[in-house]
From Swiss-Prot:
GO terms for biological process: methylation; ubiquinone biosynthetic process. S-adenosyl-L-methionine binds at R108, G139, D160, L205. Gene3D superfamilies: Vaccinia Virus protein VP39. HAMAP family: UbiG. One of its GO terms (cellular component) is extrinsic component of mitochondrial inner membrane. The lineage of its organism: Eukaryota, Viridiplantae, Streptophyta, Embryophyta, Tracheophyta. Keywords: Magnesium, Membrane, Metal-binding, Methyltransferase, Mitochondrion, Mitochondrion inner membrane, S-adenosyl-L-methionine, Transferase, Transit peptide, Ubiquinone biosynthesis. This is Ubiquinone biosynthesis O-methyltransferase, mitochondrial. Its main location: mitochondrion. It comes from Arabidopsis thaliana (Mouse-ear cress). Its EC number is 2.1.1.64, 2.1.1.-, 2.1.1.114. It catalyses: a 3,4-dihydroxy-5-(all-trans-polyprenyl)benzoate + S-adenosyl-L-methionine = a 4-hydroxy-3-methoxy-5-(all-trans-polyprenyl)benzoate + S-adenosyl-L-homocysteine + H(+); a 3-demethylubiquinone + S-adenosyl-L-methionine = a ubiquinone + S-adenosyl-L-homocysteine; a 3-demethylubiquinol + S-adenosyl-L-methionine = a ubiquinol + S-adenosyl-L-homocysteine + H(+). GO terms for molecular function: 3-demethylubiquinol 3-O-methyltransferase activity; 3-demethylubiquinone 3-O-methyltransferase activity; polyprenyldihydroxybenzoate methyltransferase activity. It is found in: Mitochondrion inner membrane. PANTHER family: METHYLTRANSFERASE, UBIQUINONE BIOSYNTHESIS O-METHYLTRANSFERASE, MITOCHONDRIAL.
Length: 322
């Protein structure tokens, strides 16, 4: 009965949010613009992209005039790391704080299999379509994404800045001879980029909304990607619907997540994501939304990107490494 009441509350909340928001995109504050776009350099392709997007022209006008940072600049947010360290032991509890990720994982993997098989000319019906490819999972947590990627044949490196997450991931992976081959590292994307590591595909799901500097973070992801390699990111749109469902609904009504897990001001719109990646030499090729059905408890791929969405892009081979 309690679960039914909570679902009904969430449905009413989402309906109210739809009425409140006539547009799925809500302009961010000046502070957020400075956090997202902390560099003044723009290449020709970024300028071209911006000129066709009036909203992004506004964003660029408010960007900080700081000089370009090197890849060694960290994008870590210590407060966010502390949050995830506190619940690291629950990564593989399917009914715990990470229940939404467990439920979303099959849908995320369906998008990844489809786009990356197409990108690398692989057979999506194969049991191991990613055999022979090197993938890196940035912000891997307990390994929810790294493990199925390894089972699909990829040589996987999982990276997380929280030591407890990495330990949990290693312990769980060691229970399976296939996943035990995953290389788990407690480090950052920036450090690996400085070391010159390269991968066929770089994936970072539900991470960018937790970093201190998304633009710098995406530069590091690009630096880790081989020319013409693939990049996959997922995050939460900054809309009233997203606030209603991911913060009010998931944290306060359904209590799937600890209160304070998400900050609405840190959510990233698809326009911002596209421009950030464009500046990092990654061209976004496809974006899909995730829609949750509270009756079935399942997530579906959708054209609706007003809350959760996932993006696939390619590293421009003509520009080489950044």
């Amino acid at each position: 009965m309690l679960a039914s009441v909570r679902v009904n509350q969430l449905q009413r909340l989402l309906l109210s949010a739809r009425r409140l928001s006539s547009s799925p995109i809500i302009p961010p504050s000046r502070l957020l613009h400075q956090r997202l776009f902390s560099t003044s350099d723009t290449d020709a392709s970024a300028a071209s992209f911006s000129s066709s997007h009036p909203k992004i022209q506004t964003l660029e006008g408010k960007a900080s005039n700081k000089s370009r940072s090197t890849s060694s600049t960290t994008s870590l947010n210590e407060d966010e790391l502390a949050k995830f360290s506190a619940i690291a032991d629950t990564w593989w509890h399917s009914e715990g704080p990470f229940k939404p990720l467990h439920q979303m994982n099959p849908t995320r993997l369906a998008f990844i299999r489809s786009t990356l098989c197409r990108h690398f000319s692989k057979d999506p019906s194969s049991a191991k379509p990613f055999e022979g490819l090197k993938f890196i999972d940035i912000g891997c947590g307990g390994g929810l994404l790294s493990e199925p990627l390894a089972r699909m044949g990829a040589t996987v490196t999982g990276v997380d800045a929280v030591d407890k997450n990495v330990k949990i991931a290693r312990l769980h992976a060691d229970m399976d001879p296939v996943t035990s081959t995953i290389e788990y590292l407690c480090t950052t994307a920036e450090k690996l980029a400085d070391e010159g590591r390269k991968f066929d595909a770089v994936l970072s799901l539900e991470v960018i909304e937790h970093v201190a500097n998304p633009a710098e973070f995406c530069k590091s992801l690009s630096a880790l990607t081989i020319p013409n390699g693939a990049t996959v990111l997922s995050t939460i749109n900054r809309t009233m619907r997203a606030y209603a469902s991911t913060i009010v609904g998931a944290e306060y009504i359904l209590r799937w997540l600890p209160k304070g897990t998400h900050q609405w001001s840190s959510f990233v719109t698809p326009e911002e994501m596209s421009m950030i990646l464009q500046r990092a030499s990654v061209d976004v090729k496809e974006i899909a939304g995730f829609v949750y059905n509270p009756i079935t408890g399942r997530w579906l791929l959708s054209d609706d990107i007003s809350v959760n969405y996932i993006a696939y892009g390619t590293k421009r081979k003509d520009l080489g490494d950044i």
